[in-house]
Structure formats: structure tokens, C-alpha cells
Amino acid sequence: MSRISAEAEKVRHALIEKGIETPMIALTKSKNERRIGIENRMREVMQLIGLDLTDDSLEETPVRLAKMFIDEIFSGLDYTNFPKITNIENRMKVSEMVLVNDVTLTSTCEHHFVTIDGLVSVAYYPKKWVIGLSKINRVVQFFAQRPQVQERLTEQILLAFQTILETEDVAVYMKATHFCVKCRGIKDTNSYTVTSAFGGVFLEDRETRKEFLSLINK
């Protein structure tokens, strides 16, 4: 098993301490062992719903699903996949808001294992550190690649950046469509869900929060 980076461990510990870590157990098997286990069980599931796995269109589906679960859509359950973050000292004394708007987010509803599709905006006021802008996208993607509920995902992203940047002054805004609502149950194709999380000056100062919300809605 690969080792978890110090940055990833700090973030994981912060989430556990606050009680907002995704419910999960320790990974004791290798990726290949987990892929094989999922493949075998997905084969059973597909047969139980009546699919013919001798058909050439379906016979490799259990293999594809196992790879997708481990290497792609649920890769954020494994902290060895946490993005490498290099904190850059804020020598330029940047003091204005840094905002990355409309980060594409694709996650999976943990209740029905169908898609959550949306956009995320992340802002912070630098203190000691800044980070590369693409790292914001990568951290968002890491936490999205898990079975999720949107409210917890929003809080996880907030706390992750507060931990990495060593500042409370972070804001997160998320707008997403839930396919568990769109393609099953009520089958509402029009609604979306908005969540937000604020820390530091974004929480305490109404004008700062207002500025953030006006910028992301331009």
C-alpha cells in the first residue's frame, strides 16, 4: 500500500476531528484485490437483475465497473490519491480575495449510487500561503470522487482548504443536480440544490460574503 502524504493526513485528521469525514473503513487489501472482489460481486448483481453475461456487450462490464469504482469515481476514498499540494509563501503579500469560479464537479449520491453533477466556487483570503490555482480543482475533484451527500461535500472542501492554507478565511458555494431526483423517484428534471459553507471573514463580515456571492453570480 502507498503511503499517505503529510498534507493528506492533516486534512483527514481535521475532517475526523470535526465529524465530517465520509463514513468508511480502513483499506487493507490492494487495489487489484479490491478490483477482483468488486468484479465478482458485480457479476452476481448483473445476473440477479436478469442480464446475460455471455453477450459480448456485457461480458466485460463487471471488469469495467470494478476499474471505474477503484480508479475513478470512488478514488477519493483512498487518501494515497490525495493531490500533491505545494504551499507557496505569500511573499507578494497578496491580500485580496482569490476566487476560482465554476469548478466542474461530478460526484455520486451515496444513497442511490447515481450521479451528482454541478459547479463549485472556492474563494480564500491569503495569509501566509497561496497555492496553485489548479490545486483547487484537484482537491474539489478528490472529495467529489466518493459516495457523497452535497452538504457534507461542501463542508469537507471548506475544511480541507482551511487546513491546507492555514486560514479560516475560506468560502465554498456549490450548485448541483442530483440524478437520484432527476432519473428516479419524483423524476424532477428541473430542480437543483445549492449549498454553501463560510469561514473566518466570509462568515463574520456580511459585506465580504456579499462580495463573494456577487462575484460568483456575475
Swiss-Prot record:
Its EC number is 3.5.4.16. It comes from the Bacteria. Keywords: GTP-binding, Hydrolase, Metal-binding, Nucleotide-binding, One-carbon metabolism, Zinc. The keyword Zinc applies. Zn(2+) binds at residues 109, 112, 180. GO terms for biological process: one-carbon metabolic process; tetrahydrobiopterin biosynthetic process; tetrahydrofolate biosynthetic process. Pfam families: GTP_cyclohydroI. The keyword Metal-binding applies. GO terms for molecular function: GTP binding; GTP cyclohydrolase I activity; zinc ion binding. InterPro entries: GTP-CH-I_C/QueF (IPR043133), GTP-CH-I_N (IPR043134), GTP_CycHdrlase_I (IPR001474), GTP_CycHdrlase_I_CS (IPR018234), GTP_CycHdrlase_I_dom (IPR020602). GO terms for cellular component: cytoplasm. Pathway: Cofactor biosynthesis; 7,8-dihydroneopterin triphosphate biosynthesis; 7,8-dihydroneopterin triphosphate from GTP: step 1/1. It catalyses: GTP + H2O = 7,8-dihydroneopterin 3'-triphosphate + formate + H(+). NCBIfam families: folE, PRK09347.1-1, PRK09347.1-3. Toroid-shaped homodecamer, composed of two pentamers of five dimers. PANTHER family: GTP CYCLOHYDROLASE 1 (PTHR11109:SF7), GTP CYCLOHYDROLASE I (PTHR11109). Belongs to the GTP cyclohydrolase I family. This is GTP cyclohydrolase 1. It comes from Mannheimia succiniciproducens (strain KCTC 0769BP / MBEL55E). The gene is folE.
